[in-house]
């Protein structure tokens, strides 16, 4: 068996009001999810922003490489169109807006 163990999502921006932006909560658009009740499956799932940096970092049990990850968790639905809110260990950088986020299919709640 091969293939992805994660769903594709796009980082759409930060949670915000009309004038204030709250960077501690990210808004994600998950591919194939278009209604609020479809987001139920993804609540509590881990998500990851994978990116490459300039310098190598040591990875546990592997060679040093340029790949880095910011981990987060999907917390709740946002609106009625299948968007979700996620909190990351450190806030996502603004340059990540419009880029891919991996939504892992664990932990399972079924």
UniProtKB/Swiss-Prot annotation:
InterPro entries: Ribosomal_eL33, Ribosomal_eL33_CS, Ribosomal_eL33_sf, Transl_B-barrel_sf. GO terms for cellular component: cytosolic large ribosomal subunit. Signal peptide: none annotated. Coiled coil: none annotated. It is found in: Cytoplasm. Its main location: cytoplasm. One of its GO terms (biological process) is ribosomal large subunit biogenesis. Pfam families: Ribosomal_L35Ae (PF01247). Gene3D superfamilies: translation elongation factor selb, chain A, domain 4. The modification N6-succinyllysine is found at residue 63. Keywords: Acetylation, Cytoplasm, Ribonucleoprotein, Ribosomal protein, RNA-binding, tRNA-binding. The modification N6-acetyllysine is found at residues 8, 63. One of its GO terms (molecular function) is tRNA binding. Belongs to the eukaryotic ribosomal protein eL33 family. PANTHER family: 60S RIBOSOMAL PROTEIN L35A. Component of the large ribosomal subunit. Component of the large ribosomal subunit. The ribosome is a large ribonucleoprotein complex responsible for the synthesis of proteins in the cell. Required for the proliferation and viability of hematopoietic cells. This is Large ribosomal subunit protein eL33. The lineage of its organism: Eukaryota, Metazoa, Chordata, Craniata, Vertebrata. The gene is RPL35A.
């Amino acid at each position: 068996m091969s293939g992805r163990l994660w769903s594709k999502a796009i980082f759409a921006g930060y949670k915000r009001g009309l004038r204030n932006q709250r960077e501690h909560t990210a808004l994600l658009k998950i591919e194939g999810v278009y209604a609020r009740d479809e987001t139920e499956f993804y609540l509590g799932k881990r998500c990851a922003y994978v990116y490459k940096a300039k310098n190598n970092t040591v990875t546990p049990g592997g060679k040093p490489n340029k790949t880095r990850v910011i981990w987060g968790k999907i917390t709740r639905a946002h609106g009625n169109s299948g968007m979700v809110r996620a909190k990351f260990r450190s806030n996502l950088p603004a340059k990540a807006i419009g880029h891919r986020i991996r939504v892992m299919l664990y932990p399972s709640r079924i």
